[in-house]
Swiss-Prot record:
Record-annotated C-type lectin domain positions: 105-211
Annotated S-S bridges: C95-C104, C98-C109, C126-C210, C188-C202
Membrane topology: Single-pass type II membrane protein
Sites where a glycan is attached: N120, N130, N162
Lineage, opening ranks: Eukaryota, Metazoa, Chordata, Craniata, Vertebrata
One MF term in the entry's GO annotations: signaling receptor activity
Protein name: NKG2-D type II integral membrane protein
Tissue: Expressed by natural killer cells and by resting thoracic duct CD4+ and CD8+ T-cells, but not by thymocytes or other hemopoietic cells. Expressed by DC cells.
Residue ranges that the UniProt entry lists as topological domain Extracellular: 75-215
Region (Disordered): 14-35
Its job: Functions as an activating and costimulatory receptor involved in immunosurveillance upon binding to various cellular stress-inducible ligands displayed at the surface of autologous tumor cells and virus-infected cells. Provides both stimulatory and costimulatory innate immune responses on activated killer (NK) cells, leading to cytotoxic activity. Acts as a costimulatory receptor for T-cell receptor (TCR) in CD8(+) T-cell-mediated adaptive immune responses by amplifying T-cell activation. Stimulates perforin-mediated elimination of ligand-expressing tumor cells.
A Pfam short name: Lectin_C
Species: Rattus norvegicus (Rat)
Listed transmembrane segments: 52-74
This protein's record includes keyword Zinc-finger: no
Amino acid sequence: MSKCHNYDLKPAKWDTSQEHQKQRSALPTSRPGENGIIRRRSSIEELKISPLFVVRVLVAAMTIRFTVITLTWLAVFITLLCNKEVSVSSREGYCGPCPNDWICHRNNCYQFFNENKAWNQSQASCLSQNSSLLKIYSKEEQDFLKLVKSYHWMGLVQSPANGSWQWEDGSSLSPNELTLVKTPSGTCAVYGSSFKAYTEDCSNPNTYICMKRAV
């Protein structure tokens, strides 16, 4: 008989600890869909806005709105103010056409003549140019005449009938228009400055001012 060999028929024991560890390491660390949930949570957290940020945004919006409203009202106010100034200046400063070399002021034409003549001659010179000697009718509208420094014949004379002072057109002198400084012999008047006139002998030669209404 042949010899019987003793074989160890016990099932072989495999060291499965390392194999199991490999398998566990190969398994996914999260459940299916968990990564998507995490990403969504991160996005939601990013979308969260702090209350301080909201307050800053509101303050900025209110500031911009207030600035826009303020600028709008300021523009309206400036426009109205400019229109008012233009209308007033246009009305007061309007002056129609005047002859060459004449001064136009408040719708009247003025000419200063440097030649010396008696009052009657000065009056005739103005009449030849469709004008009359200077008449003061409003300090406000003839304000530029206060700057005149020399003496000029004007259209003011003393009436021989009653001794009153009248303009060429027959109207009486108003003390609110002109201050008249009288001398014993003068029956005509020269304009000085600052709305003051001085009586003088009508035969004395003086320069004169002609005046007429602008067309």
